[in-house]
């Protein structure tokens, strides 16, 4: 079977790596891919960008692709699934209408309010003065979100009213996020611990994937600006069996049912970013309509089932007939980034050490490319995700950072504390 995977990040490299394990997969085309997917078994890159929907469809048709899997949110929100389905091509992901769960935070908040899905109190504004008046009335801390897609960076957790006002002006007047910031969502600040809860959905049924926890802030101790994610581990210990059941009952299943009721049934990876309070009550911080990045990398390290089998079950509406099997050992991934990410990174630097990695480490490429000499060079902000399994999170962290120590380029940096919450729990249990 020939597959097309759309995207160029660490998430796509991890999906491709896992799909290539399937005996039924003969070849995977990755568009546009990166230096890691270019050298992965059964894989080759195609130079078609994720925003070129016509080019991607033409590629899939020319190559007689059996199934297409979409990694990033941009083509999903742009309607790539609608485009492929209209041409009779099998593709796994939500339609443009269903992808509004991520494409518009205001849409997602209204959807949750309409269907009784627990989330933070909120208000939507397009006027600067009205938004600032709202913030002054509520006080800080408070959360300011750009309505549209902003590559994971359109959320400001303002600890003061002054900071909140500046964020509002940047988004609504200063064009900080372009069209994505033409409308803002102001939310109450939620206390608790975050977790990523990702499910495969076939339109009617949801199959939960392994839980995970991301590290959004750029610096150790969870300080500094938000990023697309600086590392993740799986499973998330905060999600106990009881909380897991509650998330399915109160959030995932009502979301799937609500999308059907609204006439926009959801198929694809449904990502619920959660806040779990001290009482174990989950609330939705955000919905994404695709697998998380970097959560995909440690989650795929643990998946023992054939990913192609699961995707086919979803395409056939049969997710209620399958189960996903997981390695019981935790996994952890450390993102190595290029300074001064999340600002515009320095690119084109040669990465050394990729051929001298410990055997227990898997490196998933994100912002990488091959130069004219065939060397792997940096090509983005988040460059690599160094991932490993362990008997516990402490060991997985040790293995992953052992891999990080082998890799070098001039402007590399990474957090040194990925997994700290889980490790603190492990030490407390002892």
UniProtKB/Swiss-Prot annotation:
Keyword Manganese belongs to the record: yes
InterPro entries referenced in this protein's UniProt entry, alphabetically: ATP-grasp, ATP_grasp_subdomain_1, PreATP-grasp_dom_sf, PRibGlycinamid_synth_ATP-grasp, PRibGlycinamide_synth, PRibGlycinamide_synth_C-dom, PRibGlycinamide_synth_C_sf, PRibGlycinamide_synth_CS
The cofactor binding remark recorded in the entry reads:
Binds 1 Mg(2+) or Mn(2+) ion per subunit.
Which Gene Ontology molecular-function terms are recorded? ATP binding; metal ion binding; phosphoribosylamine-glycine ligase activity
Q: Which residues form the ATP-grasp domain?
A: 109-316
Example GO BP: 'de novo' IMP biosynthetic process
Instruction: Kindly list the positions annotated as binding ATP.
Output: 135-196
Its Enzyme Commission number(s) read 6.3.4.13
Keyword Nucleotide-binding present in the record's keywords: the answer is yes
Looking up SUPFAM superfamilies in the UniProt record yields:
Glutathione synthetase ATP-binding domain-like, PreATP-grasp domain, Rudiment single hybrid motif
Reactions mediated catalytically: 5-phospho-beta-D-ribosylamine + glycine + ATP = N(1)-(5-phospho-beta-D-ribosyl)glycinamide + ADP + phosphate + H(+)
EC top class, in one word? Answer: ligase
Tell me which family the UniProt entry assigns to this protein.
Belongs to the GARS family.
Question: Which Pfam families does the record match to this protein?
Answer: GARS_A, GARS_C, GARS_N
Q: Which residues bind Mg(2+)?
A: 286, 288
The protein, known as: Phosphoribosylamine--glycine ligase
Cofactor needs: Mg(2+); Mn(2+)
Alphabetical UniProt keywords? ATP-binding, Ligase, Magnesium, Manganese, Metal-binding, Nucleotide-binding, Purine biosynthesis
Q: What is its pathway?
A: Purine metabolism; IMP biosynthesis via de novo pathway; N(1)-(5-phospho-D-ribosyl)glycinamide from 5-phospho-alpha-D-ribose 1-diphosphate: step 2/2
């Amino acid at each position: 079977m020939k597959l097309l995977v759309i995207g160029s990040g660490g998430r796509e490299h991890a999906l491709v790596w896992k799909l290539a394990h399937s005996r039924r997969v003969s070849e995977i085309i990755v568009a546009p891919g990166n230096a890691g997917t270019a050298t992965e078994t059964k894989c080759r890159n195609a130079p078609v960008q994720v925003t070129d929907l016509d080019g991607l469809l033409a590629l899939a048709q020319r190559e007689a692709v059996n199934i297409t899997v979409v990694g990033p949110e941009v083509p999903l929100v742009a309607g790539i699934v609608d485009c492929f389905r209209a041409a009779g091509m099998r593709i796994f992901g939500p339609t443009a209408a269903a992808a509004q769960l991520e494409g518009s935070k205001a849409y997602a908040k209204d959807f949750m309010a309409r269907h009784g899905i627990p989330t933070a109190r909120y208000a939507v504004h397009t006027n600067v003065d009205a938004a600032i008046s709202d913030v002054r009335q509520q006080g800080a801390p408070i959360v300011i979100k750009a309505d549209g897609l902003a590559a994971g960076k359109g959320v400001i957790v303002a600890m003061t009213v002054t900071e909140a006002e500046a964020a509002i002006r940047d988004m609504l007047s200063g064009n900080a996020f372009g069209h994505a910031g033409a409308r803002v969502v102001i939310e109450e600040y939620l206390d608790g611990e975050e977790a990523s809860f990702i499910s495969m959905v076939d339109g009617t049924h949801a199959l939960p994937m392994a839980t995970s926890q991301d590290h959004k802030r750029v610096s150790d101790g969870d300080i500094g600006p938000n990023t697309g994610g600086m590392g993740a581990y799986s499973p998330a210990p905060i999600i106990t069996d009881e909380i897991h059941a509650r998330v399915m009952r109160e959030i995932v299943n009502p979301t799937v049912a609500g999308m059907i009721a609204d006439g926009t049934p959801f198929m694809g990876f449904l990502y619920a970013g959660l806040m779990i309070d001290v009482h174990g009550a989950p609330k939705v911080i955000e919905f994404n309509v695709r697998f998380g990045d970097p959560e995909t990398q440690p989650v795929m390290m643990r998946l023992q089932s054939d990913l192609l089998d699961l995707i086919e079950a979803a395409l056939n509406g049969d997710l209620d007939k399958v189960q996903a099997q997981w390695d019981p050992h935790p996994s952890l991934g450390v993102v190595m980034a290029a300074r001064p990410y999340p600002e515009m990174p320095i690119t084109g630097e040669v990465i050394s050490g990729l051929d001298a990695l410990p055997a227990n480490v898997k490196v998933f490429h994100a912002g990488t490319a091959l130069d004219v000499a065939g060397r792997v060079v940096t090509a983005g902000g988040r460059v690599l995700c160094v991932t490993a399994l362990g008997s516990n999170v402490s060991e997985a962290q040790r293995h992953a950072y052992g891999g990080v120590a082998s890799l070098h380029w001039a402007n590399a940096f990474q957090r040194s504390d990925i997994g700290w919450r889980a490790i603190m729990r492990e030490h407390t249990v002892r």
